[in-house]
A protein has these predicted regions:
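Structural recognition of the beta-strand scaffold that forms the well-ordered cores
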Residues: 63-67, 72, 105-110, 135-141, ...
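Soluble non-cytosolic domains of exported or imported proteins
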Residues: 62, 78-83, 113-117, 121, ...
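N-terminal secretory targeting modules
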Residues: 1-67, 72-79, 90, 94-103, ...
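Oxyanion-hole/transition-state-stabilizing segment in secreted/luminal serine hydrolases
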Residues: 65-67, 72-73, 99, 116-152
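Alpha-helical scaffolding within the catalytic cores
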Residues: 44-53, 89, 116-130, 152-161, ...
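Post-signal peptide N-terminal segment of secreted/secretory-pathway proteins
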Residues: 89, 95, 103-105, 136-141, ...
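Solvent-exposed loop/turn segments at secondary-structure junctions
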Residues: 70-73, 111-116, 142-148, 177-181, ...
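Contiguous mid-protein beta-loop-alpha structural module that forms a pocket-lining wall or clamp
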Residues: 161, 165-257
Length: 411
């Protein structure tokens, strides 16, 4: 009897321990599951996700992508591969794929400090060409975007790109948390318009911190990047969403809306490369004839995400020859580099002219730079027209550097 009671006592102890600590924050499991459930703000239409899961279970090739900023790239934990996106990839393979899950492929297209606008320029190359046309994609820019109309339009363009290339692509909208908030208020109407499943971390994290469910240090490493436990929480929320979609009664397939949620649209962005093969684009590089080897790097490769670019030659004898581009477009995005503070090469200001009119001056050497990307929409029209764009160093910066990281346009 004593042995039986001892065994029973050990069993009860283990059950209680599992209830208290089977989650990253070591809190009551029921409370944790309620937190997870609260992050699911909309299940959207489940038809696309059900098809993806059916393909995974059948052993068919399935391509998963994640597009976002530093949280998606894996910032926070000691190892970036402990980020939520990598955890999600491992979890969905383990739960739904046969065998070792080798039929499921993953491409993490996260890049620190970047938002939806640059995402439109990166999408075709960094998501599709580096990986493949996704069957499932997570889009996460809620703590990087500033919430203005341009970011809302860019977010919609990314959703549209994924669905147009593959109408059966399951797009998941993920809104990360930060101590300064997020832009889920601007993104949720777009996601609702496309019937997307959505997870919002912010309200639940804020509520949990307010009620001392866990400490700030348990979730955040700083003001935005989660701890490994925070990333695990995000993964659990995404997996709970997938499980809910899997178990629910099948919805009728959702058609891609004929119109757009917000116009003018930024959909259909084409990236321009220095080895330009686009007959619509004519470029004279002027003094921007060098290649910058210090542009932003990807954690997954430790190499530049923009190895091809246009760097202004630092030369006291430079004649300040402008970068000149002629093209037909509706929208044009210019991305320049914020030179790392303290770098021996000093960067300066460049003026941007469109059809002879100065539209902006950008400072590539402003304080706080870390070789980061600075995207700006410099042409924004409803109808395509022919334009001439000039970029040249501003007075006083003729001897300094400036890097055009990349360009993107729509027709």
């Amino acid at each position: 009897m004593k042995i039986k009671n001892a065994i029973l006592g050990v069993g009860l102890f283990l059950m209680c321990a599992a209830t208290l600590s089977a989650n990253p924050f070591k809190i009551n499991e029921n409370d944790y599951q309620q937190m997870v459930e609260k992050t699911i703000v909309n299940t959207g239409n489940n038809a696309r996700m059900k098809k993806v899961l059916a393909k995974i279970r059948a052993g068919e090739k399935v391509y998963i992508a994640a597009l976002g900023g530093s949280v998606t790239e894996g910032a926070g934990p000691a190892k970036f591969t402990d980020g939520y996106a990598y955890q999600f990839f491992r979890a969905i393979k383990a739960k739904y794929a046969p065998g070792d899950g080798k039929n499921v492929y993953f491409n993490n297209a996260g890049l620190s400090g970047t938002g939806s606008l640059l995402g439109t320029v990166r999408y075709q190359h960094d998501v599709v060409e580096v990986g493949n046309t996704p069957d499932l994609i997570i889009i996460e820019f809620a703590v990087n975007d500033n919430g203005d109309g341009i970011c809302q339009r860019a977010f919609e363009a990314l959703v549209r790109e994924a669905l147009t290339a593959n109408p059966e692509c399951a797009v998941l909208a993920l809104y990360s948390a930060a101590t300064y908030g997020n832009t889920s208020v601007q993104k949720r109407p777009v996601a609702d318009f496309y019937s997307l499943p959505q997870v919002n971390m912010l309200d639940v994290v804020n509520e949990s911190l307010k009620n001392n469910v866990f400490k700030k240090e348990a979730y955040y490493t700083d003001i935005v990047h989660p701890t490994i436990e925070g990333h695990e929480f995000m993964c659990d929320c995404l997996m709970a969403l997938v499980d809910k979609l899997d178990k629910a009664k099948a919805d009728s397939p959702a058609a891609i809306p004929e119109g757009f949620f917000k116009e003018p649209v930024l959909y259909g962005m084409k990236r321009i490369f220095p080895d330009n093969k686009d007959s619509n684009v004519k470029i004279e590089v002027g003094d921007f004839k060098e290649t910058d080897r210090k542009c932003q790097t990807l954690k997954k490769t430790n190499t530049s995400d923009f190895p091809q670019n246009w760097k202004k030659k630092l030369d006291a004898k430079a004649e300040n020859l402008p970068f000149k581009m002629e093209l037909t477009c509706k929208n044009l995005i210019l991305v320049y580099k914020g030179q790392a503070s303290g770098d021996a090469e000093k960067f300066g200001k460049a003026e941007v002219y469109v059809d002879g009119r100065k539209v902006a001056t950008y400072d590539g050497g402003k304080e706080g730079g870390w070789n980061n990307c600075e995207p700006h929409l410099i042409i924004d029209e409803r109808k395509a027209a022919k334009h001439t764009v000039l970029i040249k160093m501003a007075p006083g910066s003729e001897k300094l550097g400036f890097t055009i990281v990349t360009l993107g346009y729509t027709l």
